[in-house]
Design a protein with these regions (language model features):
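N-terminal subdomain of nucleotide-sugar transferases
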Residues: 7-81, 186, 251, 256-257
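Carbohydrate-associated surface elements
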Residues: 60, 193, 212
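Acidic anion/phosphate-binding donor-loop and adjacent secondary structure
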Residues: 69-70, 200, 212-231, 245
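Membrane-proximal helix-turn-helix segments that form the acceptor-binding/catalytic region
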Residues: 106-110, 128-131, 135-139, 152-153, ...
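Conserved donor-binding/catalytic core segment of Leloir-type glycosyltransferases
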Residues: 20, 227-244, 249-253, 264
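Nucleotide-activated donor-binding/catalytic signature segment of Leloir-type glycosyltransferases, i.e.
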Residues: 273-299
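Nucleotide-sugar-dependent
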Residues: 244, 294-301, 308-330, 337-349
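A charged, aromatic-enriched C-terminal amphipathic alpha-helix characteristic of glycosyltransferases
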Residues: 360-365, 371-404
Length: 404
């Protein structure tokens, strides 16, 4: 190591590498995107060290209008700078999401204008964060590393009901998708179920780093003994959207299971009104709806439950996905009740013990399996070891840094 006056010239020779990190959700927000990207950015910062700077461009917490938490607009932590774009208030409707992303898109371009970067990393579930990454990377003529958490074109093709709008929107989305994915240097697919869909994009190299288990769930798994009051509690926590299809399963299952089972639904989202309407239509009284809670409060809710619930709607697009929620629920020794199809169904069957598994929206199958189930608790230590978020993030950060 040079010493004295030569040290100044030595520092000039060191080239600091700059990474632009794009993610719509980041801590302290409550969402799968936030839980994935917050620890990954920290691991990237750690491995990059003093010769690497990371610019995170994200949003103020906005996942749920019913959950408010303060966060700094600009935050500097070591070699990482976090820029949070303030978004208009919304209720999670389609047009609300369009307006929110338009604001994020334009502000991100302003924040990054004139700055030098060596790599753009973009974590995207709705395609447009990936597209934002493409726009910036192409303008600056630098590599683009994408982390793809959903196949947005597939999802919109399934969810959108208006045929005229769909006929205009889907070709437009496919054009954006083609440009974005063909430009990318590398694409990480969060689910191996996406692999066949992406086989048409030949330019990038691929990895398959999944979601993982956060330490908060491993270290605070208290596992209290049931009080044996005769009523089983089934808890769902997360988004209440069209994608989860809770309005197609929980009211009907609650009616079929009867008073011996109590559902707790913790969360918010665009399809909550449909869930409420269906509960009222069926006159169901054994379902409790609660607002979103912090992760520490969620731990308490999980620990006081008997079953932990996961469900996706019966759309073809969802046969390729692997919901992040399974990594959260399987850390507890409680039985998991999962209504999923396709790749997620196979993944859970092969990796998660003590699970009540059924096809999406199949009320009769769920009710029958619940009634025939002999209650037990099972530790899933091998699953926890295999899918630790820390281990996955270390490998993924190394992969990202290899493109500098």
């Amino acid at each position: 190591m040079p010493s004295g006056n030569l040290y100044f010239f030595y520092e000039l020779l060191i080239v600091k590498m700059n990474i632009l990190y794009l993610t719509f959700y980041f801590e302290p927000d409550l969402s799968a995107g936030s839980f994935r990207n917050s620890p990954l950015a920290k691991e990237l910062s750690k491995q990059g060290g003093e010769n690497c700077h990371i610019d995170v461009v994200t949003t103020q917490p906005n996942r749920y209008s019913s959950f408010k938490v303060e966060a700094k607009e600009r935050e500097d932590v070591g070699n990482m700078s976090i820029h949070r774009v303030d978004l208009p208030s919304h209720k999670s409707g389609m047009m609300d999401q369009v307006r929110s992303f338009r604001k994020y898109f334009t502000e991100a371009l302003k924040i990054t204008k004139g700055k030098h970067y060596d790599l753009v990393f973009a974590s995207s579930s709705r395609l447009f964060t990936a597209y934002l990454g493409y726009v910036i990377a192409r303008r600056k003529r630098i590599p683009l590393y994408l982390d793809i958490r959903d196949i947005f074109v597939d999802t919109m093709n399934n969810v959108m009901k208006n045929k005229f709008i769909k006929s205009l929107l889907i070709p437009f989305l496919k054009l954006i998708e083609k440009r974005t994915f063909n430009y990318a240097t590398h694409i990480n697919l969060i689910s191996a179920g996406f692999k066949p869909y992406f086989s048409k994009f030949k330019s990038p190299s691929y990895t398959y780093f999944t979601n993982g288990i956060d330490d908060i769930f491993i270290g605070n798994n208290l596992q209290p003994i049931r009080d044996n009051d005769g009523v089983f509690t089934i808890t769902y926590a997360g988004n209440i959207g069209e994608g989860q299809g809770l309005h197609k399963i929980i009211p009907q299952a609650a009616a079929g299971l009867g008073s011996g089972y109590q559902f707790k639904v913790i969360g918010d989202g665009g399809a909550k009104s449909m869930l409420v309407a269906e509960l009222e239509r069926l006159g169901v009284s054994n379902v409790e709806l609660l607002h979103p809670v912090s992760r520490n409060e969620l731990l308490e809710q999980y620990n006081n439950s008997d079953f932990l619930f996961l469900h996706l709607n019966d759309y073809e697009a969802f046969e390729k996905v692997l919901p992040s929620k399974i990594f959260e629920l399987a850390t507890f020794n409680k039985p998991v009740v999962a209504g999923v199809g396709g790749y997620a169904n196979r993944f859970i069957y092969e990796n998660v013990d003590n699970v009540i598994l059924f096809q999406p929206c199949d009320v009769d199958s769920m009710v029958a399996k619940m009634k025939n189930y002999e209650y037990k608790n099972v530790e899933r230590q091998e699953f926890i070891r295999k899918f630790s978020r820390d281990n996955i993030n270390q490998d993924m950060a190394r992969s990202i840094l290899s493109y500098l």
